[in-house]
Amino acid sequence: MTLFRDRGVVLRTIRLGEADRIVTLMTEHHGKVRAVAKGVRRTKSRFGSRLEPLSHVALLGWQGRGDLDIINQVEVIDTFRVVREDLDRMAPAMSMLEVVDQIAQERHGNPRLYEMLVGALAALAERDSPMVAPAFFLKVLALEGSAPVLDVCVSCGEDDSERLVAFDLTEGGVLCRSCRRGRPVSPGGLALMRRTLGGGLAGVLAEAASPVVDEVTALATEAMQAHLDRRLRSVRAGQVS
């Protein structure tokens, strides 16, 4: 077995036997890693509560010959305690973990996705912004090469913003008045999505809750679910309408 060091965010855990857990992490250099934490469920475990979902950790482990590695040592970088203790922040945080769990490839490094996840969790800990998760979804879609087309009608090429009035997941972007189908998109919603993908993230995260933010949240969530070809279990009931 090969010894490795890395940093990672715990995405999820499942029980293994009487005392162990299988921990899934998004790491900086090794992509998604599934590893056994031996004895983690014992009262006097050397890991304590450091391997719970959301924990950002530095780890030392052994890379196994099969699908599972073995965690040897763990040091906490951040527990994102503010997020854990606030249900309004925990829900979007868990949806972001779920997205990364679905997109990341095992043992295939994706430092940018790791950095985006850590950055999004830090932003959520800093402020209870309703735009953190939808912005994360849109940015991840862009990273995947699947960002929605927002500047021109994906059917006919119309580029007059005032005529772009609908969003169609099948087509992968906005549609004009002549081609419209799918769900309506408001000028404000279209502008906010463009700002999100255009680099004005600080201003986007400063947006207060509003009908436009709700609209973008629904659109971004639907776009991500279409990309994954599955519903996100962690998305609150009623969040997508």
Where are these regions (language model features)?
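Non-catalytic alpha-helical scaffolds and adjoining flexible linkers that form interface surfaces
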Residues: 1-241
